[in-house]
């Protein structure tokens, strides 16, 4: 049975870092935000937070709240891997889409970090779609919560706290991923 481990969490909580750890373990990673970023460029827009948010909202409005997840399903299957990591679930409709597609093979891991910790990370990472104030981060939180992010976080199988050092977080993610890798090889 194919296993999908998906990371959910508020912006800058550590989803991308968790996915990097998976990639270092040779687990294929599908980044849901890449679907949005690709659509932003396809529409000829500047890849900033405002346009990224507008396109993400528009896709969900026109194609359904699970639009991004549905676009990722074929990418997941194309990996041909028994275990795939999905970075960036944003709402309960996406969780339901993946659960319908992959059944018990779908595992949702929420990553938690407080607002102030997340904002300090945003300031350091310098992505084009990042916000430049704590109020901007709050607005992005509200936008993502309006997509059902809170319900998706509540639906997670496991929570990893990311309020401490990077080393602690990496160890926690490694432990969780190794647990699922081990259970995948024991079938």
Curated annotation (Swiss-Prot):
Segment forming the signal sequence: none
Protein keywords: ATP-binding, Nucleotide-binding
InterPro entries: NTP_hydrolase-rel, P-loop_NTPase
Spans through the membrane: none
Residues annotated as binding ATP: 9-16
UniProt keyword ATP-binding, yes or no: yes
SUPFAM superfamilies in the record: P-loop containing nucleoside triphosphate hydrolases (SSF52540)
GO molecular-function terms, A-Z: ATP binding
Protein family (similarity comment): Belongs to the UPF0200 family.
HAMAP family listed in its UniProt record: UPF0200
Full protein name: UPF0200 protein MA_4660
Source organism of the structure: Methanosarcina acetivorans (strain ATCC 35395 / DSM 2834 / JCM 12185 / C2A)
């Amino acid at each position: 049975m194919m296993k999908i481990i998906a990371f959910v969490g508020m912006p800058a909580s550590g989803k991308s870092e968790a996915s990097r750890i998976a990639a270092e373990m040779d687990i294929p990673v599908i980044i849901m935000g890449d679907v949005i970023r690709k659509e932003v460029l396809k529409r000829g827009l500047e890849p900033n937070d405002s346009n990224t948010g507008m396109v993400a909202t528009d896709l969900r409005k026109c194609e359904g709240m699970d639009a991004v997840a549905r676009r990722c399903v074929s990418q997941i299957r194309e990996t041909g891997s028994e275990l795939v990591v999905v970075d960036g679930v944003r709402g309960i409709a996406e969780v339901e889409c993946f659960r319908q597609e992959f059944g018990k093979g779908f595992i949702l891991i929420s990553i938690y970090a407080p607002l102030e910790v997340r904002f300090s990370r945003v300031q350091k990472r310098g992505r084009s779609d990042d916000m430049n104030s704590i109020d901007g981060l709050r607005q992005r939180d509200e936008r993502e919560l309006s997509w059902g992010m809170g319900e998706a976080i509540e639906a997670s199988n496991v929570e990893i706290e990311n309020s401490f050092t990077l080393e602690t977080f990496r160890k926690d993610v490694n432990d969780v991923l190794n647990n699922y890798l081990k259970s995948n090889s024991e079938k």
